[in-house]
């Protein structure tokens, strides 16, 4: 079973078994690192069931727009229910493979696909799920405006005094489909400026936020 398949295997129980209390702080720090303003447009790549949406909504307000992208129809069904319960009218969901994401995917889902439309791009615990995560990074960031903020939140093996937890972390990531050795935040460190970084839970959770350099090629 491949990593994407493992990600969707327990979709119905995802919110219960995702250990969100452990990983919530990483999400919130990552979203804070985007420096969002009211009215901003945010691309949430690998949005899952929409755990990021409440915090994003607080930052961008009713005048902003969230576009959540996920490959799993089941995850998006749960995200849609979350949106309905909260009455958010400014969240769009797109079912797409992040590794081939482009404006045509957005248009097909009825999303305004103006060139370089996004003020921020967010990856929380999602890139390490993807087989070709560098390509997913390129596709998503190509949809953002110059000087957009980007955040990557992901996982590695616990470090130093927390190494005793490493076997448990490795097993949990394997069951969920994440490659704990991927370290996808390294691409953000190379390709953005003004990088902010945080390390949580004995180094298990890594958070990076940076500003995109101008002139990235857009893929249509």
PLM region spans:
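A short SAM/SAH-binding and catalytic strip from SAM-dependent methyltransferases
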Residues: 120-132
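A short acidic, Gly/Pro-enriched loop at the edge of an enzyme's catalytic core
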Residues: 99-121
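Class I SAM-dependent methyltransferase SAM/SAH-binding core
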Residues: 43-45, 49-101
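C-terminal alpha-helical "lid/dimerization" subdomain adjacent to the S-adenosyl-L-methionine
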Residues: 151-207
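Conserved class I S-adenosyl-L-methionine
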Residues: 1-35, 51-55, 78, 165-171
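Helix-to-beta-strand junctions that scaffold the AdoMet/dcAdoMet cofactor pocket
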Residues: 61, 130-131, 144-145
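C-terminal lobe and adjacent flexible extensions of AdoMet/dcAdoMet transferase-like proteins
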Residues: 208-220
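A short glycine-rich, Lys/Arg-flanked "PGG" loop and its adjoining helix->strand segment in the class I
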Residues: 134-146
């Amino acid at each position: 079973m491949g990593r994407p398949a493992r990600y969707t295997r327990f979709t119905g129980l995802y919110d219960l078994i995702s250990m969100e209390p452990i990983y919530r702080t990483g999400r919130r720090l990552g979203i804070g690192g985007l420096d969002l303003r009211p009215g901003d447009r945010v691309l949430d790549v690998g949005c899952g069931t929409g755990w990021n949406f409440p915090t994003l909504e607080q930052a961008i307000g009713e005048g902003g727009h969230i576009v959540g992208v996920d490959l799993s129809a089941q995850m998006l069904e749960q995200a849609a229910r979350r949106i309905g319960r909260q009455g958010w009218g400014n969240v769009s969901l797109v079912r797409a493979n992040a590794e081939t994401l482009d404006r045509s995917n957005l248009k097909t889902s009825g999303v305004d696909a103006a060139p370089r439309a996004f003020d921020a791009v967010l990856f929380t615990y999602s890139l390490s799920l993807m087989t070709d995560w560098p390509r997913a990074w390129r596709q998503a960031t190509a949809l953002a405006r110059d000087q957009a903020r980007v955040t990557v939140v992901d996982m590695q093996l616990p470090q130093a005094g927390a190494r005793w937890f490493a076997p448990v972390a490795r097993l949990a990531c394997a069951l969920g489909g994440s490659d704990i050795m991927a370290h996808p935040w390294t691409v953000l460190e190379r390709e953005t400026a003004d990088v902010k970084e945080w390390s949580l839970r004995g180094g298990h959770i890594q958070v990076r936020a940076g500003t995109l350099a101008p002139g990235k090629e857009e893929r249509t």
